[in-house]
Amino acid sequence: MPESSIVVRPEPGGAPSNRLQAAGLAHATGVFAQLAATVPLPAAPRPIVVADYGAATGYNSLLPIGAAIAAFRRRTRTDHAVLVVHTDLPDNDFTALFTTLADDPDSYARKDTASFPSAIGRSFYSQILPSQSVNLGWTSWSTMWLRRPAGELPEFADHVHVEHSDDDTARRVYTRQAAQDWHDFVAFRGRELSPGGKLLVLTAAVDAAGRSGYGPLLDAIVAVLDEQVRDGALTRDEVARMSIPVLGRSEKELRAPFAPAGRFESLTIERLEVFDAEDRFWDRYLLDGDAVALGTHWAAFVSAAVFPTLASALAGGTDDPRAADFVRHLEAGVAARLASNPQQVQIPLALIVLAKQR
């Protein structure tokens, strides 16, 4: 399954203000800059090491890392090297990542000549950097993907998201997998962080009532899939295999690896917030009343984020000749349904800061 940040590309024009509209990103960037202002730094010539876990194309991490480097520069010489390590799975599009770093006007590599980008193509559910080497870490919209692909998890035929399923067995398996994944992710970061180092995690959460959000989107997806079955474009077995292996975690679940002593792999939770992020598409709709644009924007986002995963459940997998049409028709159908019944989308997020003891 992906370990990549769910990318929210800037809109045409690429202004930083547009990029910061990605849910929760502006707040997390501010917190990350605060961490960079206080985290212990190595003496030159040893580089300051920043890790970007689940980098994807780099779009979501450019501004946070740039803000951190700016904070470093208020504490160091301008020639003190900053080594930025972007990590993702081997099949990530690293060409797109390095193109972003070279060409994007928000790229830290364009703004700071003593910053040096690099990449590692390995799963972050193992140790991927030397022990005690990372001074500051960032990950956003990545750790909510389950490690195991949907095809290796129990099928549930009544929904595309397990939290909306009545299949108790499937729900238990997904929950156990999410717990194990979080445990392992935290454990290996505890080894990699240097003494006093810190890691910021921005990830999907559930609210106080246990709701994971995104209700209008998920309802629209299920409705359009049912239509495609009735029209003969999909089989019921194919739809039964379609699931989104993303799980939000509660505050209790996020704290679980640290129980009961409050420490795990020399890490403590310095900060934990669970909040509903802004729905920027809804905010725009309230201003312009354009329901078609609301549906189109949300459908495009969810199409890029999860429709390829759903398409992998087709009889021919990702190579199925219907795959492109499937994604196109699903996106159009979701857009139409959202436009016909405009609703705000709840986006529960968690921001966690983990600190390594000195």
Language-model-derived ranges and their functions:
Residues 289-358:
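C-terminal target-recognition/interaction regions appended to catalytic cores
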Residues 195-319:
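Substrate-binding/catalytic lobe of Class I Rossmann-like enzymes that use SAM or dcSAM, i.e.
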Residues 27, 177-181, 246-250:
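Soluble or luminal CAZymes and related metallo-dependent hydrolases
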Residues 1-132, 145-165, 206-207, 324-353:
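N-terminal charged/capping segments associated with class I S-adenosyl-L-methionine
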Residues 151, 193-195:
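Helix-to-beta-strand junctions that scaffold the AdoMet/dcAdoMet cofactor pocket
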Residues 132, 181-188, 192, 257:
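Short, conserved SAM-binding segment of the class I
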Residues 139-184, 203-240:
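Mobile active-site "lid"/loop adjacent to the S-adenosyl-L-methionine
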